[in-house]
Amino acid sequence: MTTVDQYLSAADHAMQQGQPPLALQLLMAALAAFPEHPDILSRLAIDAYRRGAMREAIAYFERALAVDESPGNRCNLAMALCDVDRYASALQTIQALSERQCEDPLIQFTAARAWRGTGNPERALRAISRAIDAAPEDADFRLLRAQISVDQDHWDSALTDIAAVPVLRLSPFQHYRLCGLLMQTGQFTRAMPEYRALVARAPAYAEAWLGLAAACERANDLDGMQDALTRVQVLPLNSAQHAGVNQMQGKLASRRNDNTSACRFLGAAYEADVSDPLWKSQVGFDYGQCLDKVGRYAEAWQVFNTAHATRNRIKTDAAGDHQALDFFALLRVPVSGHWPALAAPADHRPDPVFVVGFPRSGTTLLEQILDARDGLVSFDEQPYLPKTLLALQNDGIVYPSELAALDAQKREQLRNYYFKQTEALVPDRDGRRLVDKNPLNWARVPLIRALFPQAKIILALRHPCDVILSCYMQNLRSTVLG
């Protein structure tokens, strides 16, 4: 009689010989002979997982766990459940084990995925940090913690983890995730060479070409965007990838003021059968804007309504700094009408120019005008001042009522923290004055006055009806509203 080990060994040999169908046939024969053996069930689950048959894989993992509640079987099942977005089931499977085996990095990694998927970023961050403590060189662990940080707008923490990822040892998929994180943190010019390195080693990776096109568009390299789209269109594409190409083609046409073509491309993307609601909503906003530009107002309004409804159905549980940075909480706090005159700081760094206003009121245009002038340098909209406010509050200082009590040392410490953040995008100012464009910083004017007494504040004004309509036409996604 053939033993379990003999079946598994024969299946291994078939895989090594490049015969996956034979390997599966041997595993099925083994299952017929030993229907409840956990090793056979696990191997069948892994085989199904590799084939992308996730429902089949989960069924085998569940059967394996039913006969052998080993940590490995429990972790494998939870990981597969995460892969199909069944995060609540994954958490139920892994939570107790993760609390017992805090030092096992893979278990903590799996638990972190489940916690993140169920909307508990704090627990996710604790779990993934334990995994990294045990295995600091693991790229997947670093990338997940960076993603959790990005989810919460903790960009500085995310960039720290990204910098620790060994890029040269990444798989193409890991490299693609790293590129995506750079895009999410506004590092477009850093993302472009990473995408180019990725497509050089994996030229058939369609999503990487699309990512490169998106990075080029954000960096205003329209020729690079066109080249990436030309390259990706010669590849065999599935329906979702075709939709992605249409989206990028539409954005390129729009940037070139060919709104008729943009509507055609974006309309095709919008009508595509793609299940990702986040992507679908973004395409809706892009399409609606093009419809508006060509005068198809009723259609545009309908598309915007659908895009908002799709966006609102997405579960958003981002917490992070939300309580401390919440814009509306700032508005509820009374501000003293007394504005004491403060002496210029002794560090001789010129105080920034702050461009504020309501979103869609023209702040970006003002920023671009200022950035074009000698002696000024701007950076992409960043939460540097909100983060500085958070640092102040974390020190137990009540904002804004206790600002007047700040001593010179604390002011200097907070100024240093603000300027240190700006170095991520402006490492060498060469004496130039920073232009900080973050529209809703007008709610933080008391902090600006306290830390940057020589700062200039420019308020952009636009008719409120235009502002509200323009905001409705945008996919405004900030978790902390500036």
Describe the predicted segments one by one:
Residues 35, 68-69, 102, 136, ...:
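Short coil turns that delineate tetratricopeptide repeat
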Residues 16-17, 50-51, 83-84, 117-118, ...:
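Register position in tetratricopeptide repeats
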Residues 5, 39, 72-73, 106, ...:
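Start-of-helix register in tetratricopeptide repeats
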Residues 282, 298, 302-414:
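PAPS-dependent sulfotransferase catalytic core
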Residues 152, 185, 199, 205-207, ...:
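PAPS-dependent sulfotransferase catalytic domain
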